[in-house]
Amino acid sequence: FRGPGKYPHRTSGEQKRRNMLSGILLQPGAWFPAFGEVKDILISSCSFDQLDNPFLVTLNEGNRGERICLEHIRGTRLMKAAASVESWGDSSLKDVRLSDVSLSYVGNKDQEIVGRTPSKPLTDYRALPCWGLYLHNLDRVILRNVRLDCENGKVGPASCFDNVGSVEIYNVSF
């Protein structure tokens, strides 16, 4: 996935916006309730360059989820928002694994992200209280060979774990 887009967004009007928003956006029930399970998902071998956000996985009301794996993910020149895996529904997301993930951010000098209290995303990424990885309402997380870096200075923490049960960390750097 590479940004900016060759052609402008159809909905950008006079702005003729070409930025690429998110590489992966897995969000059942983003626009209206979509009840059911999200399980046994494998997202593998993806590369992202010059995107606003590499990936956002969000469960909403009426969704249950387990066994979500993102592996062999590379992101360069990422611009605006941390990667995130979140549950805002009735139950937490169980068994999330990030393995062999390397994300490099351009950097955000916006001091407003520090201490921000995130709310449920509507239909896309949004500003978060960290620049690299945000996890919310997850039961069990395994981070293996995860690297986060920021090219032009860091504002705020690299990662935020909000209401996360057990976390196993193996070879993680930022």
Residue ranges, per PLM feature:
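Extracellular/periplasmic carbohydrate-active domains that bind, remodel
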Residues: F1-F174
